[in-house]
A protein has these predicted regions:
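Bacterial N-terminal signal peptides
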Residues: 11-22
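Bacterial Sec-dependent signal peptides at the C-terminal "C-region" and cleavage site
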Residues: 20-30
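Bacterial N-terminal signal peptides that target proteins for export
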Residues: 2-13
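Generic anion/oxyanion-binding catalytic loop in active/binding sites
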Residues: 17, 42, 87, 190, ...
Length: 263
């Protein structure tokens, strides 16, 4: 019986793998060349800083523009929806995310986040409303992140709905500093503290009230709407309807972006 070295056997195995792989790669290349080209159609190129969108039905899309307009696209027809909101359109602010209610067929509610301005300060605010005659009506403010700060970035703002039908909303840390000596304190403290909404995921009932099973409800000094904390600028959130999990995307300063599962 002949004895073969480990190196010899390894080379033979490697050669067999190559023989098996090359045809597969060629087939994959052929399939992609013939079937993997994306098909797309440009619906409109008349948008100004689009930020969020919601499919109202199979043909209508409602789009938020940070510059302050809502646009309803039906096929190629664009209608402007009047909002009259006091929007801080500067930096990363403006009209932000928009989602339709999980019960939209019954209540026709739409949920919108925007950078609300007051006395030169701003914050992330959440409203819900209906649309009638190309304007928003029945407007209710459901939430505003506290405190207001003198910053025009890191609003977060993304919306989704969890398995139980709660609304989840992201709020950024707002990059809130006024002097160089405070930078370290702000980055280490604010998103980690439970007495403010900065750098948090917020969990609400659809009417803006606080769910009774929120994790920090009843904790001394904690704001009851907080669901998770310690975020920088979470500008993506997704509910996987297959397994019920919720994920957020948290932007890093120069790389270091994170995808976090909320548990």
């Amino acid at each position: 019986m002949r004895n073969y070295s480990i190196e010899y056997v390894s080379n033979i195995i490697f050669f067999i793998i190559i023989l098996l792989t090359v045809p597969s790669l060629s087939l994959a290349k052929y399939l992609c060349e013939s079937d993997c080209e994306p098909n797309y159609e440009i619906i409109t190129n008349d948008l100004n800083y689009p930020w969020g969108f919601a499919f109202l039905d199979e043909t209508r899309i409602l789009i938020s523009e940070r510059s302050g307009l809502l646009k309803l696209i039906d096929g190629k027809l664009i209608q402007n929806i009047e909002t009259r909101l006091q929007v801080n359109f500067s930096g990363q602010g403006g009209l932000l995310d928009i989602k339709k209610s999980p019960n939209y067929d019954q209540d026709k509610y739409l949920y919108l986040t925007y950078s609300k301005i007051k006395k030169g300060l701003s914050t992330t605010a959440l409203i819900r409303f209906n649309i009638e005659s190309n304007r928003i009506v029945n407007v209710e403010e459901l939430f505003e992140a506290l405190p207001y700060v003198r910053s025009n970035i890191h609003y977060g703002s993304r919306i989704t709905f969890d398995e139980a039908g709660h609304l989840l909303l992201t709020v950024g840390d707002r990059f809130n500093y006024t002097t160089a000596s405070r930078i370290a304190d702000v980055f280490k403290a604010d998103p980690q503290r439970l007495d403010n909404h900065l750098g948090k995921t917020i969990r609400l009932n659809l009417d803006g009230t606080t769910p009774k099973d929120n994790p920090f409800l009843g904790l001394a000094g904690a704001l009851p709407e907080i669901f998770t904390y310690g975020h920088r600028n979470p500008q993506g959130i997704y509910h996987n309807s297959v397994d019920g999990q919720v994920y957020i995307v948290d932007h890093g300063p120069k790389g270091g972006d994170e995808i976090n599962q909320l548990v």
